Amino acid sequence: MSVALRLALQEERAEELSQRVRRLLGPFTGTESVLDAGCGTGALAFALAPHVAEVVGVDLRAEYLDAARERAPGNVRFIEGDVTALPFEYGSFDISACHRVLHHLHRPELAVSELARVTRIDGRIFLADQLGSVDPLRSYEMDRFERLRDPSHQRLLPDADVRGYLDANDLVLLTSDVTRERVDLERRLDLSGVSDDERAKIRGPAPAAPYEVEVGWYVSRKPGRG
């Protein structure tokens, strides 16, 4: 996804994301140290920053990090790193988050395991991502379309897969929600600078416009060892 598209979507969703973060993760004490794994251009980090002591954003793409640093408040810092092999010690954060990232990863289960590892005992793990269909054919067609639109796309996870990753790491699900989000495909293609030829290829398998997607939101707790 281009930096321009990320920043445009970030601006559009900023207030909604801020409200949702406060509802799902609040109330905050103001002393929390938070990880934003796969931070992109900083959408989640900036939503959390007013409520916590520190946010550390991690991403592999330097152009995203550069754009994020230009807009960062004083309690937010960004470093280059891999969300499936995080450069932090066990229990480094009070809250570890991964927002709209899992579908970009070859091994999303490794990212969830890493989030669990770097979160302190009784800390929280926050996941959010577009969800895949339980119907194999629909899932295949949607992933095919998403890869044409964004080559970094790997696979949309069904709700059951996300819950399975949480269970596999002995995380206790505190709350979850599924919301519907309308997608303006033409505007996204405009912001991405897609050529006319590429647009034609993307429109072929695209869902009928306008279309909606489901987004899953999950907050879990890391329990103490028995």
What is the predicted role of each segment?
Residues 155-169:
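Short alpha-helix
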